[in-house]
């Protein structure tokens, strides 16, 4: 039984095993657990290694990127540093080049100074040699007597004890005596320096110049005149440290201000303070309706003396403020320059014939314009880099109003003021021309600003100048003349005969303080009216007016160089007015002035040549800006004027010296006498006139005589005229035009 039961259990187990084996998959598809574990472990390890590799690679990439960025930053820094070093090197090169140029200029200046000193020493040596030769001829050489025989016999018989004394008392030679005598004479002729001498400083010299300033024609100095003036309606004037008490003399207060400033201020601060204080005082007097204006012209004269004393000590800002103030002052007294040309029929002349108030107004206006000119002259002496600190729109607007008053067309002109206004314009053009970089100033002073100014200069150029009518007030407005009521010297120029200069002192009482001027009658001026008709006075005034026109031509020439491309300035109008002026002056020389014994004929010839130079530059460099109708307008006059330069017999004009001497005696005798005086100076210096100097003087005389006679001009001007005539713009090909031209010229 037990075996049966065991057999049954064994058969059941086998069945179970078989069933289990039947349900299992094939053997080759089964993976042992170890391999399965390996398969599960391999991807995980691969993932770990790949992530670690990726992390390492990303770290390496980040490091490389950081290194690249760092290298790029360092490269850019090095590049910037190289650029900076290159810029510094260029700056150093430029600085070194400037220094080299400055050293070269300085070296050349030193060489020039040494050459001058050497030449001076050589001249002194020659003069000393000549003086020594002259003395040697006059002096007689004195022979020294030989020692006497008695002395020689005594010296032979002297005792040994006295021999030493005899040896010490040797006779001296004549040369040593002569040398000692000359040394003594030199010592006696030497002037010893005073060790206690005190050299005045700049402020002391400045104070002295103000205290000694005197207007030409006045009997008293300016400070002495102000010492006799007081403020009547202004109770007390006070500005900072400048105080004028009621009834106190103006000059005394100014002197006390000068003494206080001298102790504490340097020269530049001294000048700034004085200009400001005096300007405020002038303003208070001018704007007060009841206060007398008697002190104003003398205060303006003091301001001019302050400005021009030391140009380097007057700052640009002080000059600018002073310029604006004077323009405002002229605006206050503008009624002086707005006198109608023709008197009204309603004027019955019943007012009192007094002149003192008119004289004060004329002095204020004239001195103010002189101060404007003086300010710009001081500015011109300053460094070129500082010019732009002065000019701005306010300066230009103020001066535009001022020059329109001076260069008037609708009112009676005042010649003293015209000179200053024209010179201010000339200085402005010279400043622009001489600047290293003038583009900023050219853009500030544009062509539109110049348009009206040039028109007024054209009108001034058209006015005629006659020596007999320079003081004639009955002539028309086409002739330049000076009124006898304006005949006083200015602060810069001595124009006229200063007939009214003596009346300045008559305004002032010498024995009391005053605020109102003394009475001056117009009849006092008419007493010496015959003096104005003297020829020499007329010639002097004519010379001044001719120089005025030369200044106008200088302005045109400067504008050609500055605004050559600006058609609003350089255009056919300039050609028209220049051609008319050239033709008119040549006709006057031929018809009226040849044969007159006038010292101004050569100056008129210079104006003709100067005008031709302007026309030549217009024609040569700016022809595109000239319109054809403008050229046709003056074509006949211009052709005639140019032919007058060419039609002369060059070979025979100066051939006969005797004939030229006769011509000089007829047309230029005064200048001939002047040259003879110069020749006498040479004869006094050299004991005889050197041949080369004589030839040079003769050549100058002959050229001058030929120009005055209008028969010979210099070759360069003839070449200018020939160049214009031979240009394609003139068509002189027809026989009728050529015949009419030659007939009109008398050929």
UniProtKB/Swiss-Prot annotation:
Modification after translation, per record: Phosphorylated by MEC1 in a cell cycle dependent manner and in response to DNA damage.
Chief site of localization: cytoplasm
GO MF annotation list: damaged DNA binding
Coiled coil: 62-139
Localization terms from the record: Cytoplasm; Nucleus
Record-listed Phosphoserine modification sites: 10-11, 76
Keywords (A to Z) from UniProt: Chromatin regulator, Coiled coil, Cytoplasm, DNA damage, DNA repair, Nucleus, Phosphoprotein
A Pfam family assignment: LCD1
Biased composition annotated in UniProt, kind: Low complexity: 146-160
Protein name: DNA damage checkpoint protein LCD1
Organism: Saccharomyces cerevisiae (strain ATCC 204508 / S288c) (Baker's yeast)
Name of the coding gene: LCD1
């Amino acid at each position: 039984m037990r075996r049966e039961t065991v057999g049954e259990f064994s058969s059941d187990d086998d069945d179970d095993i078989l069933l289990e084996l039947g349900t299992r998959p094939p053997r080759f598809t089964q993976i042992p657990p170890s391999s399965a574990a390996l398969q599960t472990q391999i991807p995980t390890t691969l993932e770990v290694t790949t992530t670690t590799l990726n992390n390492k690679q990303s770290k390496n990439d980040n490091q490389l990127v950081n290194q690249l960025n760092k290298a790029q930053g360092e490269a850019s820094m090095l590049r910037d540093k190289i650029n900076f070093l290159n810029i510094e090197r260029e700056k150093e090169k430029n600085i070194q080049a400037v220094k080299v140029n400055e050293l070269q200029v300085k070296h050349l200046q030193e060489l020039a100074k040494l050459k001058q000193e050497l030449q001076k020493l050589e001249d002194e040596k020659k003069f000393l040699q000549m003086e020594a030769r002259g003395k040697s001829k006059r002096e007689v050489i004195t022979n020294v007597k030989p020692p006497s025989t008695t002395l020689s016999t005594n010296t032979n018989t002297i005792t040994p004890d006295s021999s030493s004394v005899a040896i010490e008392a040797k006779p001296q030679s004549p040369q040593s005596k002569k040398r000692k005598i000359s040394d003594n004479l030199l010592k006696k002729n030497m002037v010893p320096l005073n060790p206690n001498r005190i050299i005045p400083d700049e402020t002391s010299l400045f104070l002295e110049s103000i205290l000694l300033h005197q207007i030409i024609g006045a009997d008293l100095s300016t400070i002495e005149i102000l010492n006799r003036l007081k403020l009547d309606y202004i109770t007390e004037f006070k500005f900072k440290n400048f105080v004028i008490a009621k009834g106190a003399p103006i000059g005394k207060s100014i002197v006390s201000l000068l003494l206080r400033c001298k102790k504490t201020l340097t020269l530049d601060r001294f000048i700034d303070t004085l200009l400001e204080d005096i300007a405020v005082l002038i303003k208070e007097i001018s704007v007060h309706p009841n206060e007398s204006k008697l002190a104003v012209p003398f205060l303006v004269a003091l301001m001019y003396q302050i400005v021009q004393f030391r140009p380097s000590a007057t700052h640009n800002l002080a000059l600018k403020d002073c310029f604006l103030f004077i323009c405002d002052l002229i605006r206050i007294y503008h009624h002086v320059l707005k006198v109608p040309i023709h008197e009204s029929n309603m004027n019955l002349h019943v007012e009192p014939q007094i002149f003192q108030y008119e004289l004060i107004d004329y002095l204020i206006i004239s001195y103010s314009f002189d101060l404007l000119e003086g300010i710009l002259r001081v500015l011109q002496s300053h460094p070129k880099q500082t010019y732009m600190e002065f000019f701005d729109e306010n300066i230009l607007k103020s001066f535009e109003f001022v020059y329109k008053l001076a260069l008037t067309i609708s009112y009676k002109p005042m010649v003293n003021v015209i000179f200053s206004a024209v010179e201010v314009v000339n200085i402005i053009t010279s400043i622009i021309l001489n600047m290293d970089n003038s583009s900023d100033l050219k853009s500030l002073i544009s062509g539109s600003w110049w348009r009206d100014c040039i028109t007024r200069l054209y009108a001034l150029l058209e006015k005629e100048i006659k020596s007999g009518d320079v003081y004639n007030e009955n002539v028309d407005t086409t002739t330049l003349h000076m009124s006898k009521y304006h005949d006083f010297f200015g602060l810069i120029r001595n124009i006229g005969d200063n007939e009214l200069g003596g009346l300045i002192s008559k305004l002032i009482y010498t024995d009391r303080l005053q605020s109102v001027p003394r009475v001056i009658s117009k009849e006092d001026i008419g007493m010496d009216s015959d003096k104005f008709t003297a020829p020499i006075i007329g010639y002097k005034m004519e010379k001044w007016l001719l120089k005025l026109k030369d200044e106008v031509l200088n302005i045109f020439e400067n504008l050609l160089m500055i605004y050559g491309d600006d058609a609003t300035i350089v255009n056919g109008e300039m050609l028209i007015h220049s051609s008319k002026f050239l033709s008119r002056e040549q006709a006057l020389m031929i018809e009226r002035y040849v044969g007159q014994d006038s010292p101004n004929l050569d100056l008129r010839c210079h104006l003709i040549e100067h005008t031709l130079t302007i026309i030549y530059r217009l024609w040569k460099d700016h022809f595109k800006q000239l319109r054809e109708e403008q050229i046709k307008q003056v074509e006949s006059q211009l052709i005639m004027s140019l032919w007058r330069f060419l039609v002369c017999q060059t070979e025979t004009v100066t051939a006969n010296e005797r004939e030229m001497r006769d011509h000089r005696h007829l047309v230029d005798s005064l200048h001939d006498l002047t040259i003879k005086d110069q020749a006498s100076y040479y004869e006094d210096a050299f004991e005889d006139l050197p041949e080369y100097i004589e030839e040079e003087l003769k050549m100058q005389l002959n050229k001058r005589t030929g120009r005055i006679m209008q028969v010979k001009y210099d070759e360069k001007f003839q070449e200018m005229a020939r160049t214009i005539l031979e240009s394609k713009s003139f068509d002189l090909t027809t026989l009728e035009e050529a015949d009419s031209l030659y007939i009109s010229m008398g050929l």
